[in-house]
């Protein structure tokens, strides 16, 4: 396996990325709907229709619980490079098709090899693009397999070109480095338009300084507010009444605080933990 993807095989990864499994359904919905990518999904996909959704980067599979609650007719497939994460997803939802895939595999060929005969209507990929060695090519693969739409969440910058070298733009995680690539927004738009010239592109930017957080080792300009870094939701719609349009909105993501009873239970658990650790 490429050294940039070894981190995802650490057993702790499945534990760290399974936090939503402990949320009840109300708080799970609140958590997901705080993000702009899920907002786009709800705005553009009819809840009453049956549709195929492929999630690329499904981790431990909790998104299926949200989808079943909000889109009861969804037909879902989840893919991830992490064997521990997929093992956890299968343990929780054995009836759901979850698959381990290779990071450098061709997505179209992978789906064919897995026996997926129908092209997914929607491809969804949350916080995966920035961890790719070749993020633009990865984006192209998502576009190619979707029949109707791609919805994703990535990292962007308004000022300065994309730094594609993962040695210069990376993140320390579970004892090793992984890519953390921040795409220039205009480069991103132009790449998508070249692939889907008649498509509609919608972007929701949540501006924030990306440098200096979560073990990231990034180019110096990404530590400055004026660079305009953001966590950005991207909707690419192949079937649309607004072909060829690009709409960019500044849309701060919400803080998911949880219901009052959930917050109370969390406070009690934290207090008990402190008491147990006291001498």
Feature-to-residue mapping (PLM):
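Conserved catalytic loop of SAM-dependent methyltransferase domains
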Residues: 200-237
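A short SAM/SAH-binding and catalytic strip from SAM-dependent methyltransferases
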Residues: 121-133
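A short, conserved alpha-helix within the catalytic core of class I
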Residues: 132-142
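Short catalytic/ligand-binding loop motif for oxyanion handling, primarily in non-cytosolic enzymes
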Residues: 62-65, 85, 132, 158-162, ...
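Conserved class I S-adenosyl-L-methionine
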Residues: 151-176
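Short alpha-helix
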Residues: 178-197, 203
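Conserved N-terminal segment of class I S-adenosyl-L-methionine
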Residues: 1-117, 126, 168, 230-232, ...
């Amino acid at each position: 396996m490429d050294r940039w993807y070894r981190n995802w095989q650490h057993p702790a990864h499945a534990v760290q990325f399974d936090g939503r499994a402990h949320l009840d359904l109300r708080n799970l919905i609140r958590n997901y709907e705080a993000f702009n990518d899920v907002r786009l999904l709800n705005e553009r996909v009819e809840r009453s229709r049956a549709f195929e959704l492929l999630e690329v980067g499904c981790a431990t599979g909790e998104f299926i619980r949200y989808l079943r609650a909000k889109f009861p007719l969804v037909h879902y497939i989840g893919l991830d490079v992490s064997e521990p994460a997929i093992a956890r997803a299968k343990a929780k939802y054995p009836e759901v098709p979850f698959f381990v895939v290779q990071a450098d595999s061709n997505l179209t060929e992978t789906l064919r090899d897995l026996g997926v005969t129908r092209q997914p209507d929607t491809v969804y990929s949350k916080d995966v693009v920035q961890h790719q060695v070749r993020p633009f090519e990865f984006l192209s693969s998502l576009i190619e397999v979707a029949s109707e739409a791609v919805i994703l969440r990535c990292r962007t910058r308004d000022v300065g070109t994309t730094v594609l070298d993962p040695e210069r733009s990376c993140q320390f995680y579970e004892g090793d480095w992984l890519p953390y690539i921040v795409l220039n927004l205009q480069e991103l738009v132009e790449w998508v338009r070249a692939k889907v010239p008649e498509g509609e592109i919608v972007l929701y930017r949540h501006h924030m300084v990306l440098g200096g957080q979560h073990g990231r080792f990034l180019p110096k300009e990404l530590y400055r507010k004026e660079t305009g870094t953001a966590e950005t939701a991207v909707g690419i719609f192949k079937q649309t009444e607004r072909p060829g349009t690009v709409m960019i909105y500044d849309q701060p993501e919400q803080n998911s605080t949880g219901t009052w009873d959930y917050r109370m239970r969390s406070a009690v658990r934290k207090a008990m933990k402190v008491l147990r650790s006291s001498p």
